[in-house]
Amino acid sequence: MDVGVTTAKSILEKPLKLLTEEDISQLTREDCRKFLKEKGMRRPSWNKSQAIQQVLSLKALYEPGDDSGAGILRKILVSQPPNPPRVTTTLIEPRNELEACGRIPLQEDDGACHRRDSPRSAEFSGSSGQFVADKDSHKTVSVSPRSPAETNAVVGQMTIFYSGKVNVYDGVPPEKARSIMHFAANPIDLPENGIFASSRMISKPMSKEKMVELPQYGLEKAPASRDSDVEGQANRKVSLQRYLEKRKDRRFSKTKKAPGVASSSLEMFLNRQPRMNAAYSQNLSGTGHCESPENQTKSPNISVDLNSDLNSEDN
């Protein structure tokens, strides 16, 4: 076990350029996960191939010598198919046909099949093959048939460590990975009066429109708040009137419920009234003023009338 651990450590400590496919095949999932955790990765992949790819991408980030990213993609476990041999076929055309099609010097008149400004040896390269025309009217066709493995581009997983975060992307082709590595290696120079100036100019009228809309919204909201205040005051007045009416009704109901108390108070008032009249007459006689008997009889009549009204209300 110790020998295996030491070999794994020695393999992982090698620089990325010195790693071979044999070294990568000797690595295990646990070795890769342990290495990634030691480097600060929180959740390494449980898949062996993905963990190895994460180790290779991490080593490429820590080793600034290889900025192109080709070392990472070269170590992907997906083996690329070998380039198939090119099949070359030689087609011989008769000279008579070439002469009939205008294989003549440029100084002569234009013919039916004459080509202007065409060099004697023309070369055309395309995706399917390569065509060459020589002096001796020979055409060499170089055909490179594509295998089904080539049509499906090699796709792998890409891990990016940036600002303390780990981002893992699946299905990244090699060309895209190279472009990302080039983009990360080159610094970005932003012009002073470039894109940001235009964005500022665009943002200014937007802010003015917002400043114009805000006062209108405030003016629309002000009368609504005033109307709500007026309605609130009216509701308060109505509720106050209801409260006062209920209070009056409670007072009248209390007086009707206790007739004995009212009658006793009336009796006490009637008993006290003759004494008050006598004292009042003595005061008047002492001062020298006298009242007519009509005035003396009016005061008890007034009190009796009040008592009679109270008795009628109680009944």
From Swiss-Prot:
Highest taxon listed in the record's lineage: Eukaryota
One cellular component term (GO) for this entry is: nucleus
Biased-composition ranges, Polar residues, are: 293-315
Pfam families given in the database record: Jas_motif, tify
Residue span of motif Jas: 233-260
Q: Which UniProt keywords apply?
A: Developmental protein, Nucleus
Principal cellular location given in the protein's record: nucleus
| Domain called Tify: residue spans | 151-186
Q: Where is the motif (Nuclear localization signal)?
A: 235-242
Region Disordered, as annotated, extends over 113-145, 248-315
Q: Please list the GO biological process terms of this entry.
A: leaf development; regulation of leaf morphogenesis
The UniProt regions of compositional bias labelled Basic residues, in chain numbering, are 248-257
Q: What compartments host this protein? A: Nucleus
Upon deletion of the gene, what happens? Plants lacking both TIFY4A and TIFY4B have larger leaves and cotyledon laminae, a dome-shaped leaf curvature and shortened siliques.
Spell out the InterPro entries in the cross-references: CCT_CS (IPR018467), TIFY/JAZ (IPR040390), Tify_dom (IPR010399)
| Assembly | Interacts with AFPH2/NINJA.
Additional note from the record: Redundant with TIFY 4B/PPD2.
Database matches in PANTHER family: PROTEIN TIFY 4A-RELATED, PROTEIN TIFY 4A-RELATED-RELATED
What does this chain do?
A: Regulates the arrest of dispersed meristematic cells during lamina development.
Protein family (similarity comment): Belongs to the TIFY/JAZ family.
This chain's protein is named Protein TIFY 4B
- Which organism is the protein's source? Arabidopsis thaliana
